[in-house]
Amino acid sequence: AKEGENIIADGVNNDAVGINAFLPVLVDENRELLLVPGIYLVNDDITIDIPVTFQPGAIIKPRNGAQLTFNSEIRAGCYKIFDTEDDFYAEPEAKTSIKITGVNVRPEWFGATTISDVNAILNIADSSSAFRKVFRATTGDFKPINSTSYRSEFICKKIELSNGHYRMDKPTTHGFYKNGIFYKIDGGGYTGKGMGNSILVYTALQYEGNSFFDFSYGSWEMHELTGFKCTAYNPLEDDPYYARVGAIMLFGSTDSLITNEIWASGAKYIRNDPDGTRRGGVGIQFESLVDHSFCNLLIEHCINGIAFSSCISTGVNIKGFSNTISDFAFGNFIPEWPPVSEQTTSNIISISGLESKACGATPLFFGTNENNVVITGLLIDGRAEASLSTVTYQAIGISKSGGVHGSISGIAVNTNYGLIDDIGTGSAGSTGKTLYLNFVISGVYGSIGSEFSVINITNPQSRLNVILSLSNSSLPAMLSYSSYSTLSLSSLHVDGGTQDALIEVKSGNLIINSLDDSGSTYGKLAYVEDSVLIMPAIIISTNRNIIKGANGV
């Protein structure tokens, strides 16, 4: 570039005049712009429509409000090539000094750095500002759509992450809402080297905002984020892995979204709703998404793993490891949102393959009511992370105002209280919205003084159709107050509970379609009170007594 007249690259003299004069020559000769090492001060706008190669040490320095637009290829490695004064934390909607329309971009171009050893994360500079700058390079300036919405200037390219750990001292936001205006993004996303290779390490463990990584207000073109991890860590804190943030990652108010191979960990601060629902500490919160697909998500050492609120989403393969309350929840569990009991969201979710290991409560938890789900391949192992003790309370939990319908199938081993409990006011299905359960349950070890079962349905409005294989259980198979439910049961080594019965039916109707109960230790097949139990006559025998309580039929 120094071949061009008036291109000095000393960081003092304005090189914009020389570069603008040199570009037409390069276009006519079908040549690229080659920038050799030096500081190129730019005080006037430049638009470059040909490829640009930055040799290491070549840095463009826009000042005086100048904007540079790159409409073709940028050839540069993982080193700094832009020196800008943009502050998108102070003014996220401000004009950007650099616009890149032609290629994917790198945070390193704006000064981000990585380190291989996370324990030395504080030895490198904070990359937060570089991430804001590289994102705004992909959006250009925000342009008005109407009086309440602005949109990125062009379709965004992706941000390419390198191997290693990025130090992030501040949150990362993308689309946002400010002063009554939505600033939306059109396409773009992130592509990393793999969820264990490209890692954003957030160090502000005392931060209690909504999220560390917020990708919201995306629309029109496809948005794709794949192949990286977000985590919380600061070696100077008493607990270096304990973050108080509402969620590690938040994806909100977006359509056309793909989230693949993403790993989140470290959100550990619980805050209770007035009704006792435990929120906070979300690994990934999905909020108000349409046309969303996901694949290979890993959430570990959080309070709530993944949560869905007002989403239409389809995906495969979620892994939850050592999360305190849930691995897969429904509702918005970020504390700044209204209490779960006040949320009126609706989810339509399909997932194949959900693995839970060492969850401390209920791996699958329905906090809100209108959840229509198809979940297959749910695999739960309730043993602790570092021992054989059982820590998982129950496979499926429902809040006092929560509910679910659709179908769920899977296997759960080593739980304390079995499969599901509607706690009397939650909805495990409802009229016209049956919940279909098909499960293999093995190893139920809890004990309780009052009536309690592997399937515990005490809300008369719940409606279930259950196929259950149950073995090695200290609790009976089912307690039902449901007005109408059905059960097909195969059981082995199942205790009879307080009524010494495999099944208890109270204040409702239960149809048993099939029963294989060889080897169980209960004294009675069923106890029926204020309800009707219907089953094929062939099931009843001298060894299968049914005891009728008051008004039992």
Region roles according to the model:
Residues 23-29, 45-48, 139, 148-155, ...:
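Flexible, charged surface loops at secondary-structure boundaries
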Residues 3-32, 108-160:
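Acidic Gly/Asp/Thr-rich repetitive segments characteristic of extracellular carbohydrate-active
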Residues 24-26, 104-105, 140, 240-245, ...:
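Interface-prone segments of viral and bacterial extracellular assemblies
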Residues 131-132, 170-182, 201-217, 226-229, ...:
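Extracellular beta-strand/beta-solenoid scaffold signature
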Residues 30-67, 132-189, 195-209, 230, ...:
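N-terminal extracellular ligand-recognition/capping segment immediately after the signal peptide
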Residues 52-55, 69-83, 102, 161, ...:
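All-beta strand scaffolds that present successive hydrophobic residues in beta-strands
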Residues 5-17, 53-82, 87, 92, ...:
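Right-handed parallel beta-helix/beta-spiral solenoid domain characteristic of secreted/periplasmic
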